[in-house]
A protein has these predicted regions:
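Glycine-centric low-complexity/flexibility signal
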Residues: 1-135, 157-171
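Extracellular/surface-exposed low-complexity segments
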Residues: 136-179
């Protein structure tokens, strides 16, 4: 998970759902970990470049006997390191929801994004943090009677200022059926 320190170059981005991006002329990205269908682990911190990398996102677990409605923001995004730090981006955390029925509006956002790597010089920038993991498990039969939820989901991986190195991959979204 944790990105490697840069040793003078950019710190590696933290891994979670996927491997973190490598730092420019520096640290390797962190390894992937966790379970897409039952995500409970928080995100990891990015590797140190000149200053420390960003922090990983936390973990949210919601368990309900019947209905969960999302009309606001649930966020476990990773964070960037300090400005001009060469630090790797922190990875997104985990959001795990189990319920009978799931609903929400267009104001609803569930987010586990990885943070961008920080910049100092083009070749020495930090790697991006991996996106996190989001799983919403519901009863498929009960859910079929509901309107399709308008909730938005984001689990993008962080980027790097150097497009030749440091990009991370997106996180995972898991639902019990593809509809």
């Amino acid at each position: 998970g944790v990105g490697a320190n840069g040793g003078g170059g950019g710190g590696g981005g933290a891994g979670h759902a996927n491997r973190g991006g490598d730092g420019g002329l520096g640290g390797a990205g962190g390894a992937a970990y966790g379970d897409a269908a039952a995500p409970l682990a928080p995100g990891s911190g990015g590797g140190t470049g000149y200053d420390p990398g960003g922090k990983g996102g936390g973990a949210i677990r919601i368990e309900a006997d019947d209905r969960v409605e999302i009309h606001g923001t649930l966020s476990v995004n990773g964070s960037k390191g300090g400005a001009n730090s060469r630090g790797g981006g922190g990875s997104g955390g985990s959001i795990y929801i189990t319920c009978r029925r799931f609903a929400g509006s267009t104001n609803g956002l569930i987010s586990a994004q990885g943070a961008d790597g920080e910049n100092n010089q083009f070749d020495y920038c930090g790697g991006g943090g991996s996106g996190g993991r989001i799983a919403v498990l519901y009863d498929s039969t009960a859910q079929a009677a509901e309107p399709r939820p308008a909730v938005r989901f984001r689990a993008y991986g962080g980027t790097s200022y150097n497009p030749l190195a440091g990009q991370s991959d997106d996180g995972t979204l898991y639902f019990p059926d593809p509809s």
